Amino acid sequence: KTHVYGKWISGGFENSLCAMFGSFGESNKDYISLWKGQEDWCFEYGKSMASYFGPSGNEKLITSIEIDNEPGNDFDDPLYQSIFRSMARGIRAGDPKIKIVTCTAHAHQADKYSKDLRETFSDPQIIELFDVINVHTYAQLEKGLTKSPWTRTYPEGEDTTYLEVIEETIQWRDHHAPGKEIWITEFGYDSCTPRVMANRTGWFEKLDWRGVTDLQQAQYLIRSFLLFSSMKVDRAYLYFFDDKDEPQVHGSSGITRNGKPKPSFHAVSQLYQTLGDYRFSRIVQKNSQLYLFEFLKGKDRDQVCWVAWSPTGFRSDQKVKKNHRATEITLADLPSKPDRLLAMQTSGESEPKDFVSTSGSITFELSESPVYLFFEPKQ
């Protein structure tokens, strides 16, 4: 209450509770028998959670509950559906204001981590029970293409289903469950220090696992948030907030390292503070050399920000990753006179970026780090 939920609430964040199956999951060989005949218990458990933690109660610690995290195709599907129905109905009875979130799911064949929306959540009786479709997506290459099964690439890369997974989910939602929200509750990139990379062990050494650089982690996280903002999703949560500098998948995915900010921490903080009150408006340009998105502050069309970046990058298995690839670019047909240009922040200070502005155009350096171009209000 105080040390976990309270700190996030005081920071202005909402909390989502995940009812993990844990040792009652598929890793327990007797898990099916353990759940047999427990429908009433599932209902009461859901009701108790909602009553205590929910926004209608005294504690007001959470606003949503996810029913297990990643049961995937290893967890018996009819059993999961039964648990979901009972627990969701209990949550509704305990606090109808709580948003009920599915486990991780997507609109194609189930895998080790995600259920198939078309199978697990297509029944109209289940659709009416949930409010949010939960998606995990990583810019990972298909297994077998590289020595490591955990190789990741930049967000716009053509050799990953990173964005395709989300588009498929949106299409399924629009057709079968209109009105339901979509939350991306996991995405991210690992970046550890060279010192620990030299001491990899186990399969991470044998299969030559590699993360991205600290700068690339910042670039790819910000670009991911920007890309997600242009899609019909409601929320996106990065994974993870802190790491212990471990050279393994998910072991160095924090935006802080042992509690100390990485470049990605400053970049995400800047995005939050700079565009937090803005909303995606349109794609101005989108090609192999330039992504240019427009954001408006609320419904005020006079407060405009363009965000520009080069949609290029490196795969994590590439041993040599150049830190700075840039080119000069000129943009025309501007909405008004340029006011300021901010570089992506990677330290404690936000840095203005040089530009040359003439009548109706602006010239500046474009790189893989997004820049924020603000305009003066229209006269």
Q: Where in this protein do the model-derived segments appear?
A:
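Substrate-binding cleft and catalytic face of glycoside hydrolase catalytic domains
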Residues: K1-P149
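C-terminal beta-strand-rich structural cap/linker in extracellular carbohydrate-active enzymes
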Residues: P352-Q379
